[in-house]
């Protein structure tokens, strides 16, 4: 479909985003977790979702591996495919924000331009970039899926941090030390959400 096909029109919903947020009791927002493989993105995002669920917050977690089983199963790991992967996830996340959910996304998303693209799509005030900053040496030592070992052996191409660049955020809303305890990181995130009046519980 062409982007500006004149036969395709946008239909407004009778229920507004604000009405949905009022129903949920909190604002809709995306927490975009970014960092190297093994940095702890998925672990921290999952722990935060669990904490938010216990507080009665309506959430959904989009995980990098999971979306490649369906939504992005046709994509590889070239720069072009990575960009399309993030574009699709950004669109899904935006729809969920419009539904009034707190959306957590855990993706390496190595390029600043793609993260900025999603920020602009979702809109300022509804996009929180979470940089899980863990040194490459620590990520490689963890290597939960054995991917660094494969990349070092030349068995895995385009692996971020080894033969594909990772562009660290320059002004993330929150910068987490990935070597800290997960419980500490979750508390920092909850504090941020409360300070920004996204959740009140």
Curated annotation (Swiss-Prot):
Pfam families: APS_kinase. The active site is at residue 109. Its EC number is 2.7.1.25. Keywords: ATP-binding, Kinase, Nucleotide-binding, Phosphoprotein, Transferase. It catalyses: adenosine 5'-phosphosulfate + ATP = 3'-phosphoadenylyl sulfate + ADP + H(+). GO terms for biological process: hydrogen sulfide biosynthetic process; sulfate assimilation. It comes from the Bacteria. One of its GO terms (molecular function) is adenylylsulfate kinase activity. ATP binds at residues 35-42. Pathway: Sulfur metabolism; hydrogen sulfide biosynthesis; sulfite from sulfate: step 2/3. Belongs to the APS kinase family. Catalyzes the synthesis of activated sulfate. NCBIfam families: apsK, PRK03846.1. This is Adenylyl-sulfate kinase. The gene is cysC.
